[in-house]
């Protein structure tokens, strides 16, 4: 039998992730594999903010099409990019152990967010980050920052931005210091995206190795990520809208924190729930109900106009 084919985007970070799964497949499942690079819509359109491109699955759709055709056997994604509703026949075979979930401030001149001058230009790909930055500093000029990690850092170093915000996990995976000043926000300061820090391996549910890939699943991370995805699903949300949600486990207790609002930070809902792990999905439903009662749907409709 030939090697399994792993579909991956072509960025340095995406290939690190694909190679990480390739190595684990060989070591833990005794399966040989090879990587096929696939360009997605989100990779091709680099001159437009992600929220303006439209549609869900900007970094996953082309990979899913190849899975359905049988051209590739599995697709490795940053879990935060994976839509919460799958194409028929597809699902996540595993969710890997989470890396650092935090967002990180990077700057050449300024040590932290509060030291930025009034009206400073901050680059981010994410409306979620923009919203939470504006909550802290309404004066900031948050602008779209596209490209891979190295491209974004070059834009910072060239003076296009006073600071940029990146995912800590990506910096750690690529072993990048990033800039003179680097400071991670706590989860309380900036609630991450659903699934941030974890990888999701997507396959056909009837693939003969689907069950085998579950050996790579991290139970604790998968549990928390599925809670986050359930919350997003309840709001009919995706990864390009201003919602942050983070679930964490401490023994038999679970905490779910969420934030949702306009990208300008002017209408924002922030809530959290704590409870027993056995009631975790009930807690998600309670949290959803509170968000909906607080006007979440209306805020998300307004957010589409930004």
UniProtKB/Swiss-Prot annotation:
Entry's Gene Ontology cellular component terms: cytoplasm
Pfam family, one: Porphobil_deamC
UniProt-recorded Gene Ontology molecular function terms: hydroxymethylbilane synthase activity
Catalytic activity annotation: 4 porphobilinogen + H2O = hydroxymethylbilane + 4 NH4(+)
GO biological process terms, semicolon-separated: protoporphyrinogen IX biosynthetic process
Note accompanying the cofactor annotation: Binds 1 dipyrromethane group covalently.
InterPro entries per record: HemC, Porphobilin_deaminase_cofac_BS, Porphobilin_deaminase_N, Porphobilinogen_deaminase_C, Porphobilinogen_deaminase_C_sf
UniProt keywords, alphabetically: Porphyrin biosynthesis, Transferase
Cofactor: dipyrromethane
Pathway where it operates: Porphyrin-containing compound metabolism; protoporphyrin-IX biosynthesis; coproporphyrinogen-III from 5-aminolevulinate: step 2/4
Record PTM S-(dipyrrolylmethanemethyl)cysteine, positions in chain: 239
Enzyme Commission (EC) number: 2.5.1.61
PANTHER family: PORPHOBILINOGEN DEAMINASE
Family label: Belongs to the HMBS family.
Annotated function: Tetrapolymerization of the monopyrrole PBG into the hydroxymethylbilane pre-uroporphyrinogen in several discrete steps.
Subunit structure: Monomer.
Record's miscellaneous remark: The porphobilinogen subunits are added to the dipyrromethane group.
Name of the protein in its database record: Porphobilinogen deaminase
Organism: Helicobacter pylori (strain P12)
